[in-house]
C-alpha cells in the first residue's frame, strides 16, 4: 500500500480475506454505456467521460459494482463467489475532491437470499466496528421489492408503477412523481414543437428533434439521458396523463411511505398496513420477515437498526433489500449497499445471477477517525 491509500486500508483488506471475499483488480478506464444505462440519474451526471480512438465512449471508474459484475461475466466464473475491492473512484463534485477511495464486497450467486442480505449487512457493520472502535452507528434499511409490491397491490397502471419505482430512493423525485400522478400538468411546460410531436405520438421524429436540439446547445447525447430515452419518457408521461390516483390509493401510499420503525417492529407494522389498506402483500412480507430473522441471527445491535419504508438508494439497479450505515454528526453515510438481482442479466449474463453487496466511503471513515482523507 502506498501513502496515497488510507492508513487503515490494509486492515480492511485483511478483514475482507477473513470473510472469504477474494480481492479483484478492476481497471480505472471503463466502457461508459453500462453506467449511463443503469447507474441512476444522480451518478450519470457525475461521470467523467472520454472517447477512445475508435469512437467508443469511455469513463473513469465511478463505482465498483457494475465493473465487478462485468468482470465476473467476462471470466465466466462459477458461483457462488464473493469479490472484494479497494481503490479510487472518480465523480464530478461541486465541492471536494473528484477522486476518493471506496472498498466493498459483492456477493454473487448465493441462493439463500435472506441469508446473503443479512451477511452483507453484518460484514459491513463488523468491518466498520474494527476500523472505528467504540463508535455508535445507525443503520437504515429499506426494501425496493416491498415498495413495488405495494404499488402493484394498489392497482396502479404498469407505467406509473415503473415511474414511481424509478423515483424510489430520491424523496424529491418521488414526491414530484406522486404530485404529477394526482394532478397531471399536460404539455403546457414543453416547447411548442416538442409538445406537438408528443401529441402526435411520433417517437422517431421526437427523438430526432431532441438530438438536434442537444447538438445545437452543445450538449453531448452521452452526457446524460440519451435522446431516445428522453423521447420515450415524454411519450410515456403523455400516455399516462389522463390517469388519476384515487384518494384511497393516494392515502394508502402516503401511509406506507410514512412507516419508520425499529426493525423488530417492522414486520408487524407492515402487516397492519396491508390489512388497513385491504391489499395482499404476503409474498413480499414473507421475504422481508425471513431477512429480518437472519439479521437477528448475526447478533447485531437491533436498537440501532431502523426500517424506513420510503428509504432507497439513487442507483437504478437495486431490486430489494437496501441499507446504509452512518454515524451521528455526519450527514453522509459511511456504507451503502443492497440487492441487485437483475443487474447481471442486464449486463449480459447468460442466466440470472442474484447479487448483493456494499461499498464503504473510506474518506468519510477517515474523517470520523480524525484523519485527513
UniProtKB/Swiss-Prot annotation:
GO molecular function, one term: histidine-tRNA ligase activity
Transmembrane annotation, as ranges: none
Protein name according to UniProt: ATP phosphoribosyltransferase regulatory subunit
Function summary: Required for the first step of histidine biosynthesis. May allow the feedback regulation of ATP phosphoribosyltransferase activity by histidine.
Keywords from the named record: Amino-acid biosynthesis, Cytoplasm, Histidine biosynthesis
GO biological process, one term: L-histidine biosynthetic process
Protein's cellular compartments: Cytoplasm
Main location: cytoplasm
Additional free-text comment from the UniProt record: This function is generally fulfilled by the C-terminal part of HisG, which is missing in some bacteria such as this one.
Recorded family membership: Belongs to the class-II aminoacyl-tRNA synthetase family. HisZ subfamily.
Keyword DNA repair among record annotations: no
UniProt-listed SUPFAM superfamilies: Class II aaRS and biotin synthetases (SSF55681)
The keyword Cytoplasm appears for this protein: yes
Quaternary structure annotation from Swiss-Prot or TrEMBL: Heteromultimer composed of HisG and HisZ subunits.
Lineage top rank: taxon: Bacteria
Amino acid at each position: 500500500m502506498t501513502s496515497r491509500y488510507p492508513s487503515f486500508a490494509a486492515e480492511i483488506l485483511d478483514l475482507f480475506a477473513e470473510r472469504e471475499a477474494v480481492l479483484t483488480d478492476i481497471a480505472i478506464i471503463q466502457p461508459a454505456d453500462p453506467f449511463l444505462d443503469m447507474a441512476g440519474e444522480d451518478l450519470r451526471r457525475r461521470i467523467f467521460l472520454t472517447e477512445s480512438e475508435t469512437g467508443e465512449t469511455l469513463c473513469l471508474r465511478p463505482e465498483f459494482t457494475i465493473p465487478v459484475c462485468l468482470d465476473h461475466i467476462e471470466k465466466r466464473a462459477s458461483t457462488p463467489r464473493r469479490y472484494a475491492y479497494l481503490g479510487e473512484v472518480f465523480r464530478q463534485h461541486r465541492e471536494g475532491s473528484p477522486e476518493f477511495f471506496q472498498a466493498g464486497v459483492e456477493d454473487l450467486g448465493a441462493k439463500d437470499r435472506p441469508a446473503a442480505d443479512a451477511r452483507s449487512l453484518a460484514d459491513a457493520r463488523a468491518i466498520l466496528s474494527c476500523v472505528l472502535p467504540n463508535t455508535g452507528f445507525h443503520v437504515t434499511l429499506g426494501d425496493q421489492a416491498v415498495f413495488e409490491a405495494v404499488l402493484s397491490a394498489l392497482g396502479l397502471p404498469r407505467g406509473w408503477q415503473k415511474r414511481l419505482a424509478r423515483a424510489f430512493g430520491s424523496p424529491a423525485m418521488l414526491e414530484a412523481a406522486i404530485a404529477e400522478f394526482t394532478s397531471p400538468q399536460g404539455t403546457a411546460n414543453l416547447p411548442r414543437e416538442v409538445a406537438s410531436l408528443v401529441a402526435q405520438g411520433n417517437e422517431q421524429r421526437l427523438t430526432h428533434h431532441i438530438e438536434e436540439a442537444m447538438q445545437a446547445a452543445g450538449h453531448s447525447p452521452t452526457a446524460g439521458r440519451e435522446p431516445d430515452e428522453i423521447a420515450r419518457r415524454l411519450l410515456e408521461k403523455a400516455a399516462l396523463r389522463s390517469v388519476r390516483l384515487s384518494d384511497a390509493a393516494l392515502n394508502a401510499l402516503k401511509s406506507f411511505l410514512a412507516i419508520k420503525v425499529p426493525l423488530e417492529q417492522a414486520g408487524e407494522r407492515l402487516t397492519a398496513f396491508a390489512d388497513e389498506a385491504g391489499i395482499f402483500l404476503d409474498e413480499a412480507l414473507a421475504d422481508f420477515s425471513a431477512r429480518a430473522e437472519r439479521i437477528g441471527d448475526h447478533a447485531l445491535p437491533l436498537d440501532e437498526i431502523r426500517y424506513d419504508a420510503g428509504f432507497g438508494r439513487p442507483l437504478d439497479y437495486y431490486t430489494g433489500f437496501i441499507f446504509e450505515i452512518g454515524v451521528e454528526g455526519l450527514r453522509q453515510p459511511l456504507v451503502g449497499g443492497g440487492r441487485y438481482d437483475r443487474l447481471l442479466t442486464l449486463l449480459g449474463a447468460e442466466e440470472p445471477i442474484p447479487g448483493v453487496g456494499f461499498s464503504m466511503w473510506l474518506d468519510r471513515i477517515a474523517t470520523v477517525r480524525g484523519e485527513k482523507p
